[in-house]
From Swiss-Prot:
Protein name (Swiss-Prot/TrEMBL): Nucleoid-associated protein Cphamn1_1179
Gene source species: Chlorobium phaeobacteroides (strain BS1)
UniProt entry keywords in alphabetical sequence: Cytoplasm, DNA-binding
Gene Ontology CC annotation, any one: cytosol
HAMAP family linked to this entry: DNA_YbaB_EbfC
Length: 111
């Protein structure tokens, strides 16, 4: 039975680390927009799951409960889109390295 080559394993780990740093930089650049109420409320989030902005159509400001519900729905929609984009970036970076797709299950992004 062949012994694993630890130098090769270390090299792979270093390459994976560099790719993950690249992914982190890409996630900072990604934005996703979610909307609710037919676009009456829009939320923009980053690929790192941070809310960047909320836009509310002034026409709906009379109904606070509806505004609150729509803000929650818009933010959740945007976060879901951002999580999908983050998974795509991680999948591209992980392709073939350290288990590829199976490794991504450990990140639990957006789940």
């Amino acid at each position: 039975m062949a012994m694993p080559n630890f130098n090769d394993m270390m090299k792979q780990l270093q390459q994976a680390g560099a790719k993950m740093q690249d992914v982190q930089k890409q996630l900072e650049k990604i934005t996703a927009v979610g909307d609710a109420g037919g676009g009456m409320v829009k939320a923009t989030v980053s690929g790192k799951q941070k809310v960047l902005s909320i836009a509310i159509d002034p026409e709906i400001l009379d109904d606070i409960e509806m505004v609150q519900d729509l803000v929650v729905a818009a933010v959740n929609a945007a976060l879901e889109k951002a999580a999908d984009l983050a998974r795509e970036e991680l999948s591209k970076a992980a392709g073939g390295m350290l288990g590829g797709e199976d490794m991504l299950k450990n990140f639990n992004i957006g789940q």
